[in-house]
Amino acid sequence: MVSPDLIRNVVGIVGNVISFGLFLSPVPIFWWIIKNKNVQNFKADPILVVTINGISLVIEAVYLTIFFLFSDKKNKKKMGVVLATEALFMAAVAVGVLLGAHTHQRRSLIVGILCVIFGTIMYSSPLTIMVVKTKSVEYMPLLLSVVSFLNGLCWTLYALIRFDIFITIPNGLGVLFAIMQLILYAIYYRTTPKKQDKNLELPTVAPIAKDTSIVAPVGNDDDVNGSTASHATINITIEP
């Protein structure tokens, strides 16, 4: 009989692979941003909250750099404020936990609660895109939603084998959020404008010349009062 520990280790390894795939899933988005030199309506929220370990920290730092380079001033300011707030918050948490919690159990509880909160935000952040309002899934990548679902499902199973509430809650909610995203994608996929539709150009219509006739009085030089004035027709061609 296979031991629960072995199953848990296997699920954990698979979870690590899927997590790595989760961090790499936005690569097509940022390749598009680099090519177009514009972030358009893509959001930085998932990147700002997903930096949860060493490998992802490096990957997400690259994403943030690309997003920052091609953002407008408003987005750059927002990112700067959020990153500065995160840095100050993490410093405050570290100092507070080290000085205020004197046992390993209490420190684990405090940090675990924070991990639950930020893990939940990580999964729910793509929902900040106004899919329902715009009736478009253009800025909610399908790959990110699929990998989020697989990642949350795998880590939920991992946490349930040997119950860990701090892993179960955020990843269980992550599965629900990912399902919601996939449902939204299925609903609004057909109403999303295709890229080729956006690039359609109206046919060029050749300008049509218009002939306009103007009747103007022609005066007689010998008649100052114009009593003997005659009329002449002048044809004017107008090119638009």
Curated annotation (Swiss-Prot):
Which Pfam families does the UniProt entry name for this protein? MtN3_slv (PF03083)
Note whether Nucleotidyltransferase occurs among the keywords. no
Q: Name one GO cellular component term.
A: plasma membrane
What's this protein's name?
Answer: Bidirectional sugar transporter SWEET7c
Q: How does it sit in the membrane?
A: Multi-pass membrane protein
A GO molecular function annotation here is:
sugar transmembrane transporter activity
Q: Which UniProt keywords apply?
A: Cell membrane, Glycoprotein, Membrane, Repeat, Sugar transport, Transmembrane, Transmembrane helix, Transport
What range(s) does the MtN3/slv domain occupy?
10-48, 110-191
Q: Which domain of life is it from?
A: Eukaryota
How does the record describe its quaternary structure? Answer: Forms homooligomers and/or heterooligomers.
What does this gene product do?
Answer: Mediates both low-affinity uptake and efflux of sugar across the plasma membrane.
Task: Identify the residue ranges that face the Cytoplasmic compartment according to the record.
Answer: 34-46, 100-108, 162-164
Gene3D superfamilies from the UniProt entry: 1.20.1280.290
Disulphides? none
